[in-house]
């Protein structure tokens, strides 16, 4: 039986797809992946919603466009959005006690470990010493 690799996408992967000059390797990774192998965290949705709210202050029309895109992500990933469960929170607590780390990135990494996913991110420096399978598509298209 073949085990299918599954991926947890960091918020920076999602945001990259909105850029006018998005990194080709990121787009290639996403287009070459089976959609059902890609997962999101509720934390990424929260970060994106925060961005929408902040953008509303300076550019309401752009904010509405981004909000529509975020709503589309939520719909498209509906059965592949992971919450922060007890095991992920406990692992995050252990890792955070080792040294200061960004909360959301470390929670995402813990979620990836608990659910046996490869964490796809550009922010590898804060988690490189952790037992997390990581893929940085800015550097390489596949693990």
Where are these regions (language model features)?
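Active-site neighborhoods of divalent-metal-dependent phosphate/nucleic-acid chemistry enzymes
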Residues: 2-3, 50-56, 64, 75-120
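A short acidic, often aromatic-flanked loop/helix-cap motif at beta-alpha or helix-coil junctions
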Residues: 46, 88-90, 140-143
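Acidic, PIN/NYN-like endoribonuclease modules and their adjacent C-terminal/linker elements
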Residues: 1-3, 109, 114-143
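Alpha-helix capping/helix-boundary segments
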Residues: 13, 44, 88, 107-108, ...
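Short, well-structured N-terminal submotif of metal-dependent ribonuclease cores
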Residues: 1-41, 54-70, 141-143
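Residues that scaffold the ATP/ADP-binding catalytic core of kinase and kinase-like folds
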Residues: 16-17, 51, 91-95, 130, ...
